[in-house]
Amino acid sequence: MKILGIDPGTRNMGYAVLEKNVNKISLIEAGLIKMKPENLQFQLTQMCEAIDQIFEFHKIDEVAIESMFYAYNPQSVLKLAQFRGGLSLKILQVFGNFAEYTPLQIKKNVTGKAKADKTQVAFMVKKMLGISKDIKPLDVTDAIAIAITHAHNLRGVK
């Protein structure tokens, strides 16, 4: 089973494709989709094209994204909400459904601590997948953690 994890962002969007076989999870591909700092419509178009390419290249069985979180800057929250809405619609059009996890759920699942910092999440992601080198940037690590969380929630599924 192939799982796509997505860490939404308006400038950078991390993604990861994992393979889940019984009790083993393997990293197939992970990367960063960089959005040019243009207007929202241009960024949404870039994001949609990138999502199309991922779905065309991989036979995805499950999709999981990080849900919205609180931020202090209302403009940032508004822009991210618009972008997430576009991302959600694109996934629904191409795939049909997706799972959502809060940052606290993801951190707790991967590290055992809901208040873990990004370096702790990155450490555990590497350990769980048997990766020795650093995974950068952290948007990519977050996308992998999202996919791992979804894989763990599908325990009975092969």
UniProtKB/Swiss-Prot annotation:
Alphabetically ordered keywords of this record: Cytoplasm, DNA damage, DNA recombination, DNA repair, DNA-binding, Endonuclease, Hydrolase, Magnesium, Metal-binding, Nuclease
Binding-site list for Mg(2+) 1: 7, 139
Enzyme class: hydrolase
Positions that bind Mg(2+) 2: 66
Subcellular location: Cytoplasm
UniProt-listed GO biological process terms: DNA recombination; DNA repair
InterPro entries: RNaseH-like_sf (IPR012337), RNaseH_sf (IPR036397), X-over_junc_endoDNase_Mg_BS (IPR020563), X-over_junc_endoDNase_RuvC (IPR002176)
Alphabetized PROSITE patterns for the sequence: RUVC (PS01321)
Cofactor(s) the protein needs: Mg(2+)
GO cellular component: cytoplasm; Holliday junction resolvase complex
Cofactor remark: Binds 2 Mg(2+) ion per subunit.
Residues annotated as the enzyme's active site: 7, 66, 139
Source domain of life: Bacteria
EC number per UniProt: 3.1.21.10
Assembly description: Homodimer which binds Holliday junction (HJ) DNA. The HJ becomes 2-fold symmetrical on binding to RuvC with unstacked arms; it has a different conformation from HJ DNA in complex with RuvA. In the full resolvosome a probable DNA-RuvA(4)-RuvB(12)-RuvC(2) complex forms which resolves the HJ.
Family: Belongs to the RuvC family.
Role: The RuvA-RuvB-RuvC complex processes Holliday junction (HJ) DNA during genetic recombination and DNA repair. Endonuclease that resolves HJ intermediates. Cleaves cruciform DNA by making single-stranded nicks across the HJ at symmetrical positions within the homologous arms, yielding a 5'-phosphate and a 3'-hydroxyl group; requires a central core of homology in the junction. The consensus cleavage sequence is 5'-(A/T)TT(C/G)-3'. Cleavage occurs on the 3'-side of the TT dinucleotide at the point of strand exchange.
Protein name: Crossover junction endodeoxyribonuclease RuvC
